[in-house]
Swiss-Prot record:
The keyword Kinase does not apply. HAMAP family: Ribosomal_uL15. The gene is rplO. This is Large ribosomal subunit protein uL15. Residues 42-52 have a biased composition (Gly residues). Keywords: Ribonucleoprotein, Ribosomal protein, RNA-binding, rRNA-binding. Residues 1-58 are annotated as: Disordered.
């Protein structure tokens, strides 16, 4: 096989549709736009979501809920992740979690959740803990400190 033998796979390449290049091409005269009307015009067409004067779906459906401006968003870490990534007796702080790439940023704080198993004795400093996380950390002799 040589370079001149290479061909793209069957059906993987399509020819560009050249419009307005004579009647014989099949895309001449109106260039596939039909006759007159809004869509035949330059810059014509309706905006997305426009339903021809009928009340649009987005306005037919009732409004629901609101956005709580006081909502706190925590960076969450499970105890199972701490088990995998840290040595026995390690002290874990939000800065260490960012350094190790476990979380991207602290957001409104770090919350430790109780998913997974923990066998190592760790000192964990975070903004919030779930009840199950505290139980698992203390069960193996570790400390859960709220900062």
């Amino acid at each position: 096989m040589r370079l001149h033998d290479l061909k793209p796979a069957e059906g993987s390449t399509k020819k560009k549709k050249r419009v307005g290049r004579g009647i014989g091409s099949g895309h001449g005269k109106t260039s596939g736009r039909g006759h007159k009307g809004q869509n035949a015009r330059s810059g014509g067409g309706v905006r997305p979501g426009f339903e021809g004067g009928q009340m649009p779906l987005t306005r037919r459906i009732p409004k629901r809920g609101f956005t709580n401006i006081f909502k706190k968003e925590y960076a969450i870490v499970n105890v199972g992740t701490l088990e995998e990534r840290f040595e026995d007796g390690a002290e874990i702080t939000p800065e260490v979690l960012i350094e190790k790439g476990i979380i991207k940023d602290v957001k409104d704080g770090v919350k430790i959740l109780g998913d997974g198993e923990l066998t190592k004795k760790l000192t964990v400093k975070a903004h919030k803990f779930s009840q199950s996380a505290v139980e698992k950390i203390q069960a193996v002799g570790g400390k859960a400190e709220v900062i």
